[in-house]
UniProtKB/Swiss-Prot annotation:
Present in outer membrane vesicle formulations which are used as vaccines in human. This is Small ribosomal subunit protein bS1. InterPro entries: NA-bd_OB-fold (IPR012340), Ribos_protein_bS1-like (IPR050437), Ribosomal_bS1 (IPR000110), Ribosomal_protein_S1-like (IPR035104), S1_domain (IPR003029). Belongs to the bacterial ribosomal protein bS1 family. GO terms for cellular component: cytosolic small ribosomal subunit. It comes from Neisseria meningitidis serogroup B (strain ATCC BAA-335 / MC58). Coiled coil: none annotated. The gene is rpsA.
Length: 561
């Protein structure tokens, strides 16, 4: 080996010793292909770097042949004369230096919001990913940050830890610095009643915050429009420019209340004059609830059709079964309360009242027919014209049977006849009777056999305490054992059996409970009195010729014969 070659090798050896991993050097781009960028850093050999390290966010190669770039040494020449270089690490090193200088000097940097993480957002500042806490996104808390994603926004670096690869930035710091002067000017000129423009920056369930330029104003949901607004997002969207009136301004607390609906005339003014009670008009269903439907009768004016005012007969139906959102319906003004901004509307009032129609076409005592709609513990409902029902109470099913027994004979869907007993249009009630189709056997019987009458019947059933006497096919009387004879009877079964004929006097009539009490003892006493009266009359007629004893014997003998 010549001395010249040895000197060259020695110089290269010294040069390599000075190039350590992690050092940043300059290299020239000498070739670019599909997979690699070839650079010459003045080393023994050229180096290949992955082409991906030279592409921007759009996937475009940022360099061309002849450009000089900074690269970082990852490893020095190995036994094959190769040195591994990295463009990416060099860029990151430069970006870290820029971040450190920006933090030290308080400079403002730009970055792109590229993701959402727990507690905040991630920001790409060149090749460094930083963290933006949710509390530092704005000068006020921001509930929805989705509109920031993908946007380039300015920040300040407030925390830096290169070892842990941790960078924290603040957008709030930038806003507070830049909005200070704007806020001061705005606060000096802001007045209640003035009209101001702003940008919607955040939407919540209860309203929206509007950036007025240095200070935020609250636009409450109730001040968005005169009509009902379910959610502010129906009217507003983030980033939208709006015009509003300053309703209230607290300079000390720097709070501003805004209103959009106040820019227009209150549609409730003079509403009762425009729509007198009983007015019929058409409106559009704007909202449905469990208790009714809201109908917009003009722009910004809604009224409630309560579920009970939707249909004459279907009172428990869900409003969605009757109308749908957007339906045009005819309604009647029932009541307007301008003070409370409430309107009561009715839909059924625009239709014929089936109760009034029934009352106009039927009178008390009329016979009707209909199908059994339902059977309850208190009676039978019968379907009537117009989709309404009439009630046959248990007590009006049968003259002779109890209501509980009589109701078992009826089935749902069965056609029945009944008599109209009463019509109450106001309460929407119609009383019917089935037993009234026939005469009252009990009433007919006691009309000719009242208290004190002598009646005959047969024993239907008997026990120790008394007997049930069939006085006719449909009327019964009760004979207590104590009323069988003047002498005490301990067990009436020793005196009577089923089928025996009995003659007795009616001693009690209970029309309310429809019961008759009988007495054989009273019948015997009555006959004895009549016999005595007859004897006395004969004695008076034959005074002086015949003794009382003879007359009584004669009377008794005649009765026995």
């Amino acid at each position: 080996m010549s001395m010249e070659n040895f000197a060259q090798l020695l110089e290269e050896s010294f040069t390599l010793q000075e190039m350590n991993p992690g050092e940043v050097i300059t290299a020239e781009v000498v070739a670019i292909d599909q997979n690699f960028v070839t650079v010459n850093a003045g080393l023994k050999s050229e180096s290949l770097i992955d082409v991906a390290e030279f592409k921007n966010a759009q996937g475009e190669i940022e360099v061309k042949v002849g450009d000089f770039v900074t690269v970082t040494i990852e490893s020095v020449e190995n036994g094959f004369g190769e040195t591994k270089l990295s463009r990416e690490k060099a860029k990151r090193a430069a970006d870290w230096i820029a971040l450190e200088e920006a933090m030290e000097n308080g400079d403002i940097l730009s970055g792109i919001i590229n993701g959402k993480v727990k507690g905040g957002l991630t920001v790409m500042i060149s090749s460094i990913r930083a963290f933006l806490p949710g509390s530092l996104v704005d000068v006020r808390p921001v509930k929805d940050t989705s509109h920031f994603e993908g946007k380039e926004i300015e920040f300040k670096v407030i925390k830096l830890d290169k070892k842990r690869n941790n960078v924290v930035v603040s957008r709030r710091a930038v806003l507070e610095a830049t909005l200070g002067e704007e806020r001061k000017a705005l606060l000096e000129n802001l007045q209640e009643g003035s009209v101001i423009k702003g940008i919607v920056k955040n939407i919540t369930d209860y309203g929206a915050f509007v950036d007025l330029g240095g200070i935020d104003g609250l636009l409450h949901i109730t001040d968005l429009a005169w009509r009902r607004v379910k959610h502010p997002s129906e009217v507003l969207e983030v980033g939208q420019e709006v015009e509003a009136k300053v309703l209230k301004f607290d300079q000390e607390k720097q709070r501003v209340s805004l209103g959009m609906k106040q820019l227009g005339e209150d549609p409730w003014s003079g509403l009762t004059r425009r729509y007198p009670q009983g007015t019929r008009l058409f409106g559009k269903v704007s909202n449905l609830t469990d208790y009714g439907a809201f109908v917009e009768i003009e722009q910004g004016i809604e009224g409630l059709v309560h579920v009970s005012e939707m249909d004459w007969t279907n009172k428990n139906v869900h409003p969605s079964k009757v109308v749908q959102l957007g339906d045009e319906v005819e309604v009647m003004i029932l009541e307007i309360d301008e003070g409370r901004r409430r309107i009561s509307l009715g839909m059924k009032q625009c239709q014929a009242n089936p109760w009034e129609e029934f009352a106009a076409n039927h009178n008390k005592g009329d016979k009707i027919s209909g199908a059994v709609k339902s059977i309850t513990d208190f009676g039978v409902f019968v379907g009537l014209p117009g989709g309404i029902d009439g009630l046959v109470h248990l007590s009006d099913l049968s003259w002779t049977e109890s209501g509980e027994e009589a109701v078992r004979k009826y089935k749902k869907g069965e056609e029945v006849e009944a008599v109209v007993l009463a019509i109450d249009v106001e309460k929407e009630r119609i009383s019917l009777g089935i037993k009234q189709l026939e005469g009252d056997p009990f009433g007919n019987f006691i009309s000719v056999n009242d208290k004190g009458s002598l009646v005959k019947g047969s024993v239907k059933s008997v026990d120790a305490k008394g007997a049930v006497i069939a006085l006719s096919d449909e009327v019964e009387g009760y004979l207590p054992a104590s009323e069988f004879a003047a002498d005490r009877v301990e067990d009436l079964t020793t005196k009577l059996k089923e089928g025996d004929e009995v003659e007795a006097v009616i001693v009690t009539v209970d029309r309310k409970n429809r019961s008759i009490k009988l007495s054989v003892k009273a019948k015997d006493a009555k006959e004895s009195r009549e016999a005595l009266n007859s004897v006395n009359a004969a004695a008076n007629a034959n005074a002086g010729t015949t003794s009382l004893g003879d007359l009584l014997k004669a009377k008794l003998s005649g009765e026995q014969e």
